[in-house]
A protein has these predicted regions:
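Residue-level recognition of transmembrane alpha-helices
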Residues: 21-25, 100-101, 169-173, 244
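Short cytosolic juxtamembrane segments of multi-pass membrane proteins
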Residues: 260-264
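Secretory targeting signals
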Residues: 26-68, 98-165, 230-237, 241
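Helix-loop-helix units of permease transmembrane domains in multi-pass membrane transporters
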Residues: 72-105
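Aromatic- and glycine-rich beta-strand/loop motifs that create alpha-glucan
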Residues: 1-22
Length: 264
């Protein structure tokens, strides 16, 4: 399995998309840097740049990038007509597809880590003290895991549609926008923990996890009002990671099952 993961990483060297994607991870932090002039405190500066990473980069960039990269990884052997040779070796197709999914997981973590470090550089360059930054940096790494799990349904769709890239990308686009909207809608942010959209979809799930870690010692009236409405519905680590572990097991099993049954 480790050898397969290493091979998948070596393939990434030939994919400009990977490096372009990592460059995109710095786009939101750099764009938000222009708004730091209106910030009054170090805490607000850190909260602001990290919220741009959590609520913009993760939702609007990372999830679709994971699906696009997955479509490249999953069908590379078919496009180059090498899957037959791999099966003859033999290479277990379940292990092959799972190694690709693990590479995507590492990419998601790397994406959030790079974005977080760029945020730190922006803060230091503009003279802000990174108060509470490292705590939020760790939360960002964990959100990368949540976004990876959130992308698995779309990756399953990519495998089911079997190289129909356009349809997959269109559906992923709407799924991404839907998650972004759900993460800002009180109707879904104030649902109790259970089998509902506010718990099972990555957008509201990630918001109800990450928002509680912002430094709330100095809050505006609007933020205080939002906290009053949403804080009773914050989720703890056991709840959040319990959900994503179950979802990951289910969708990885389905992806592996469909991938194994595809014709070579």
């Amino acid at each position: 399995m480790l050898k397969l993961i290493k091979c998948e990483f070596l393939k990434l060297k030939r994919k400009p998309l990977v490096f372009i994607s990592l460059l995109l991870s710095v786009f939101m932090p750099l764009a938000y840097a222009f708004f730091l002039a209106d910030v009054n405190t170090d805490v607000d500066a850190v909260n602001g740049v990290m919220s741009s990473l959590f609520q913009l980069s993760a939702y609007l960039l990372l999830m679709p990038l994971l699906v696009i990269l997955a479509s490249n990884l999953l069908f590379e052997e078919l496009d180059n007509d090498t899957l037959k040779n791999l099966v003859t070796v033999p290479v277990n197709r379940t292990k092959l597809v799972l190694s690709k999914m693990l590479v995507l997981l590492l990419f998601a973590v790397g994406f959030m880590a790079v974005g977080g470090l760029v945020n730190l550089a922006v803060l230091l360059f503009q003279g802000w003290e990174p108060v509470g930054f490292w705590n939020l940096f760790g939360v960002g790494i964990e959100e990368g895991l949540i976004m990876w799990v959130g992308a698995l349904p779309c990756i399953l769709l990519v495998v089911l549609l079997n190289k129909n890239y356009i349809v997959s990308v269109v559906i992923t686009f709407f799924y991404t926008i839907a998650n972004s909207i759900l993460s800002t809608n009180d109707m879904f942010l104030t649902q109790p923990f259970g089998l509902n959209i506010g718990t099972l979809f990555p957008g509201p799930l990630a918001f109800r996890w990450t928002f509680q870690f912002y430094d709330q010692s100095q809050t505006s009236v609007e933020l205080a009002d939002l906290l009053e409405r949403v804080s009773p519905y914050f989720l703890n680590g056991v709840q959040v990671f319990g959900v994503i572990i179950v979802e990951a097991i289910v969708f990885l099993a389905l992806i592996a099952f469909v991938y194994r049954r595809q014709e070579i």
